[in-house]
């Protein structure tokens, strides 16, 4: 099976693959060459995921801008 380019994966697919790569690298069983290859793939996946998140944020900002009363605020994970 051919590996898809990171930009052609959905956000969820990229995140799942990135999680797998991190897990494999943390185990420490990969050779140096394999580790570098996985690291390179991980960087590409992280970049593509970041780009997809930025696009989603822009879409939300545009949608929120259509309603002048709406205020876009930062997410606070500590709120209960």
Swiss-Prot record:
Annotated catalysed reactions: Exonucleolytic cleavage in either 5'- to 3'- or 3'- to 5'-direction to yield nucleoside 5'-phosphates
InterPro entries: Exonuc_VII_S, Exonuc_VII_ssu_sf
One Pfam family here: Exonuc_VII_S
Subcellular location field: Cytoplasm
Gene Ontology biological-process annotations: DNA catabolic process
E.C. designation(s): 3.1.11.6
A GO molecular-function descriptor: exodeoxyribonuclease VII activity
Example of a GO cellular component annotation carried by this entry: exodeoxyribonuclease VII complex
Keywords, alphabetical: Cytoplasm, Exonuclease, Hydrolase, Nuclease
Subunit record text: Heterooligomer composed of large and small subunits.
Name of the protein in its database record: Exodeoxyribonuclease 7 small subunit
């Amino acid at each position: 099976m051919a590996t898809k380019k990171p930009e052609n994966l959905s956000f969820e697919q990229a995140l799942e693959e990135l999680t797998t790569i991190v897990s494999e690298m943390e185990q420490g069983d990969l050779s140096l060459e394999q580790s570098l290859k996985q690291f390179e793939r991980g960087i590409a996946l992280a970049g593509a995921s970041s780009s997809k998140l930025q696009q989603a944020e822009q879409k939300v900002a545009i949608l929120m801008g259509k309603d002048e009363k709406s205020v876009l605020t930062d997410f606070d994970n500590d709120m209960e």
